[in-house]
A protein has these predicted regions:
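Active-site environment of divalent metal-dependent phosphoester hydrolases
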Residues: 1, 58, 85-98, 112-115
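A short acidic, helix-capping loop that chelates divalent metal ions and anchors anionic groups
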Residues: 1-3, 59-62, 145-146
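Short, acidic/polar N-cap/turn motifs at the starts of alpha helices
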Residues: 38-42, 93-94, 122
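Short, structured loop/turn "capping" segments at alpha-beta junctions
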Residues: 41, 45, 85-87, 132
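Active-site neighborhood of phospho(di)ester-bond hydrolases with catalytic His/Asp-centered motifs
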Residues: 53, 84-90, 104-108
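A short secondary-structure junction signal
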Residues: 53-56, 60-67, 97-99, 116-118
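Acidic, His/Gly-rich catalytic cores of divalent-metal-dependent hydrolytic chemistry
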Residues: 97-162
């Protein structure tokens, strides 16, 4: 079987089908509005700048910030921003990774947590004069209700087919 992030992997095909289904329904004006959103947000705080990106400062699909990446890979993707903390998602797993140049915080996933725990996850970052306080929380969510609504609307199944 192809690696998970390979376009030929069954999960990628299932994701692509859902993505196309969504694009067909939201229409061009919403697609353009989403495309016009900034790729990053920067907030200046007492703890230093917080940079918020989807995956990394390099791009929306960059995979260099995962817990399995080497320090050199992480530094190549995230260093040089001048931020004291960088918040990102894309991995669908909550974690905090202190780096020499900044505190890296994966803020998690509400709908598809990949750690096997069927709980929505979110992160609260609080800036203090002493640095950052990171609270990563899990809460229950009605996954069955969401899946029922998806089926009723004809959204392709998330389960991959070989």
């Amino acid at each position: 079987m192809a690696p998970l992030h390979d376009p030929g992997h069954p999960y990628q095909r299932a994701y692509a089908a859902r993505f196309e289904w969504t694009l067909d329904r939201i229409g061009g004006s919403i697609q353009r509005a989403l495309a016009d959103l900034p790729r990053e947000q920067r907030v200046t705080t007492s703890a230093g700048d917080l940079l918020v990106v989807h995956a990394s400062p390099r791009g929306l699909d960059d995979r260099a910030g995962g817990p399995h990446n080497t320090a050199a890979e992480v530094e190549a993707a995230y260093a040089g921003t001048g931020a004291s903390a960088i918040a990102f998602g894309h991995w669908h797993q909550s974690f905090v990774r202190p780096a020499r140049f900044a505190l890296l915080v994966n803020v998690a996933s509400v709908s598809i947590p990949l750690d096997g725990r069927p709980l929505a996850a979110y992160t609260i970052l609080t800036a203090t004069s002493d640095g950052w306080i990171v609270e990563q929380r899990r809460v229950t969510s009605d996954r069955e209700d969401v899946m029922r609504a998806e089926r009723e609307r004809g959204m392709p199944e998330w389960r991959p087919t070989a």
